[in-house]
């Protein structure tokens, strides 16, 4: 009997050169000498999809070696990056032209640079995307985390990606140990939702079935930012996993604290995946109340429970035969209730994962935490990158 392939995310580093307003990971980097090695990568199971992420993955100078090993394990690989290290990205893609690249761009130029805190970050990312397309790379696209500050740029950025023939991935604010953040929250929900609504209608009017299902994902983002239960079950830790820079295998990156199923540095995959610790984490997942709506958990669920998004798509494509706006955010009861005064902003805020009094667990090892006693995360990573460039 063939082994069931999984969906995996490999967090190759917690080092990051960006200073994003919605993510404090840059303040809590991993030590390079502790980061996941090829010996551990080789122990991963067969996967139908692998996302390589960070931190900023291209800070690792051995990323090519990691991709080379993962290609033996996975049918498809997509790397999430801020696009800053253009030369490294282009060099890697020359060797591996069949991988995917998603560059985080948080809006048009001014908005992006303010949110990501990278000098000339927009132009760097945009230039990298254009050069990848000129190289003939097919699986290339934008990734945007939608929030109050950049929501008005959502549709314009989508149209830019569409003109360039690129993928366009969306997310919204989440809180977890992975983001080293507990205070993220959408303040003007109707405004943000209206921009999502406009995007959804553009996606539904397209001729691409892939975009129709992305419309459903964005419908779920509106539902999430209003603090409602997930539209689809979460099966993280059952057919999907994350592995962090220390070799710790986790169900996802959305938990308040780091939940560890086992450590692949010291265990075999089969022993780890079937361990009592893994079963204990799965029990927590079954009772998790965070209701995250991130592509890492939703995409597998959309495939597994295809009839739910499929029916939604069919319904709205039928509506699109008669109107240019087949979708309305007010299809969601909570949106109508908020509009009509039956639920308050304060009540919705309490439904979110925002916790102003939370002490965030950053998921670092003791050694990585120790280095922060003497220098800030920014100083550590800046010095690391400067040293790389000198070499």
Show the residue positions of the predicted features.
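Conserved alpha-helical substructure of the radical SAM core
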Residues: 1-98, 177, 350, 361-362
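Flexible mid-to-C-terminal extensions adjoining Fe-S/redox cofactors in radical SAM and related proteins
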Residues: 2-4, 253-391
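Generic structural signal for small/hydrophobic residues in well-ordered secondary structure
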Residues: 12, 89, 103, 142, ...
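Residues immediately within or flanking Cys/His clusters that coordinate Zn2+
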Residues: 13, 17, 231, 285, ...
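Alpha-helix N-cap/helix-start and coil->helix boundary motif
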Residues: 17, 64, 86, 108-109, ...
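Residues that scaffold the ATP/ADP-binding catalytic core of kinase and kinase-like folds
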Residues: 19, 23, 60, 111, ...
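Short aromatic-enriched loop/helix-cap "lid" or pocket-rim segments at secondary-structure transitions
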Residues: 22, 63, 89-92, 115, ...
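Radical SAM enzyme [4Fe-4S]-AdoMet core and its adjacent flexible, acidic
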Residues: 34, 69, 73, 99-106, ...
